[in-house]
UniProtKB/Swiss-Prot annotation:
Biological process terms in GO annotation: F420-0 metabolic process; riboflavin biosynthetic process
UniProt EC number: 3.5.1.102
Name the record gives this protein: 2-amino-5-formylamino-6-ribosylaminopyrimidin-4(3H)-one 5'-monophosphate deformylase
Cofactor binding note: Requires one Fe(2+) ion for activity. Requires an additional second metal ion that could be Fe(2+) or Zn(2+).
Catalysed conversion reaction: 2-amino-5-formylamino-6-(5-phospho-D-ribosylamino)pyrimidin-4(3H)-one + H2O = 2,5-diamino-6-(1-D-ribosylamino)pyrimidin-4(3H)-one 5'-phosphate + formate + H(+)
Originating organism: Methanosphaera stadtmanae (strain ATCC 43021 / DSM 3091 / JCM 11832 / MCB-3)
Lineage summary: Archaea, Methanobacteriati, Methanobacteriota, Methanomada group, Methanobacteria
Annotated pathway: Cofactor biosynthesis; coenzyme F420 biosynthesis; Cofactor biosynthesis; riboflavin biosynthesis
Subunit relationships: Homodimer.
Length: 233
């Protein structure tokens, strides 16, 4: 018997609605980007994927995994990134077209965990048109995380088990790890006043690991995206 003849039980399980399966949740992070001594190079991807999976688990929306690419502003140099157009045209659009074809998805929420990916916001309408999908770009993670590889990411990372607590002192070495707070990234600080302001704060006040804060940040991001799922039903 052909698998196409199998009637799927869309109303089974602990889900918001049988229609929730038409909503996809996919993470967009950055897999190869320095985060000091205490966080791994794929911190953004791990945080975004965790939030995306938890939202899919709690709502029943279809978990679509993660995009493999990321982009970045040309004045921020702390990792390996794609040009924005390559990310959009060679990674995101083809992957979403395949997702729609295979799973009959109608809407996709992109859970963003990397600030540089904000460059693609101007292309969301294009992505939607090319893929024939409703696209929602959610920034709930990065809107609250603060300076790069500092308190926000360290705290969320600690909750997830990816922060190396034994390396926090080494993490403070801005000469060896200039990307932490972007303290040592002169070009980034010269080009973006907000980055410079945050870097000055980190130089003066440092950072901390706060498990309660990290848990709250992860849960608040999930709650915001869950509300987006509900709006789509």
């Amino acid at each position: 018997m052909s698998s196409n003849n199998i009637k799927l039980k869309y109303d089974s399980g602990n889900i918001l609605s049988k229609d929730v399966h038409s909503i996809g949740i996919i993470a967009l992070g950055s897999h190869r980007e320095n985060h000091g001594a205490a966080l791994p190079i794929d911190t953004d991807s791990k945080i975004a994927a965790n939030v995306a999976l938890n939202v899919a688990t709690k709502t029943g929306a279809t978990f679509l995994g993660i995009f493999y690419g990321a982009t970045e502003y040309d004045y921020i140099k702390h990792g390996h990134h794609l040009k924005k157009d390559d990310l959009v045209n060679k990674q995101i659009i083809p992957q979403l077209i395949n997702i729609k074809k295979q799973l009959n998805i109608k809407s996709v929420i992109i859970v963003n965990g990397h600030g540089g990916n904000n460059l693609i916001i101007e292309d969301i309408d294009k992505i939607s048109k090319k893929t024939e999908l409703k696209i929602i770009f959610n920034n709930s993670i990065i809107e609250s995380e603060g300076p790069h590889a500092c308190t926000g990411e360290l705290s969320m990372g600690a909750v997830l088990g990816i922060t190396d607590m034994t390396s926090l002192k080494e993490h403070e070495n801005f000469i060896k790890h200039p990307e932490v707070g972007m303290v040592g990234l002169k070009e980034a600080r010269d080009n973006e006043p907000i980055i410079n302001k945050e870097a000055l704060t980190i130089e003066k006040e440092g950072f901390e690991v706060n498990m309660i804060l990290g848990q709250d940040m992860l849960e608040n991001a999930q709650k915001e995206i869950i509300n987006e799922v509900k709006k789509l039903l």
